[in-house]
């Protein structure tokens, strides 16, 4: 619900800091510009100066945010949604995503996030709700960001060079275009990644899109091997839970061979970078 009206469709994006709204929602509710009429929006591929509006109240599940200043964004990544709920708005809450039932729940407690989980991984808070996990791929250690708003899994140049993909394979990469929340379109190279290890979780047979993506600079990860784990991987598990208060991420069993991990007993273990 927005300003007591709705419901409206929002995408929960754990890789976004700001919550955003679409021009369609602004028009439907007659939202007025905020006291700060424009904001700098940082997306995967670039930055933009965009208009901003103030939501008197945003409500979903156990979450209520008052006087939310939100950038107004239209982009292909919105996928027809009315807005995006960013990680900063989930501070102190738990997120439970059930991919089998196509449902998302936000709650104050961790019960929904933990339910049925086979693996718990402790993360590190970075800023504005963003969390990173320690990972290893092809013998290279780095950082991983769980991003429910990214369609594909992305890697930065530091990881690509550390893996020496060009010299190791002796082949040329497939080239693709990567779109974000801003108008910039970035070039990406598609390489099949070695097995990605996050705690006891093994992510197999994943095509990673590597590029000099703007967001890695925003997160100050441009010099550290890093990946953004997108929905091409996350969508293979039965459910995903994130406890934003305690920085814990929970996974249930995978529905495919893409992701495997040691079950249940590992719930008592955590991993710090």
State each model region's role.
Residues 1-273:
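Pepsin/retropepsin-fold aspartyl endopeptidases
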């Amino acid at each position: 619900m927005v300003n007591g009206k709705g419901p409206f469709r929002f995408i929960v994006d754990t890789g976004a800091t700001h919550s955003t709204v679409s021009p369609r929602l602004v028009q439907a509710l007659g939202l007025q510009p905020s006291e700060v009429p424009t904001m700098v929006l940082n997306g995967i591929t670039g930055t933009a100066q965009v208009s901003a509006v103030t939501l008197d109240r945003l409500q979903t599940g156990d979450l209520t945010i008052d006087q939310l200043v939100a950038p107004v964004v239209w982009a292909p990544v919105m996928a027809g949604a009315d807005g995006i709920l960013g990680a900063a708005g989930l501070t102190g809450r738990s997120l439970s995503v059930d991919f089998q039932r196509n449902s998302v729940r936000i709650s104050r407690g961790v019960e929904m996030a933990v339910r049925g989980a086979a693996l718990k991984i402790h993360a590190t808070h970075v800023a504005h709700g963003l969390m990173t996990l320690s990972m290893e791929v092809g013998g290279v250690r780095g950082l991983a960001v769980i991003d429910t708003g990214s369609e594909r899994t992305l890697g930065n140049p530091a990881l690509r060079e550390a893996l020496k993909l060009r010299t190791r394979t002796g082949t040329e990469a497939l080239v693709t275009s990567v779109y974000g929340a801003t108008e910039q379109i970035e070039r990406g190279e598609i390489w099949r990644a070695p097995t990605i290890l996050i705690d006891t979780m093994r992510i197999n047979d994943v095509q990673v899109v590597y590029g000099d993506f703007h967001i890695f600079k925003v997160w100050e990860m441009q010099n550290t091997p890093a990946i953004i784990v997108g929905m091409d991987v996350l969508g293979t598990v039965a459910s995903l839970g994130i406890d934003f208060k305690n920085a814990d991420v929970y996974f249930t069993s995978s529905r495919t061979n893409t992701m495997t991990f040691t079950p249940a007993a590992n719930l008592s273990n955590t991993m710090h970078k």
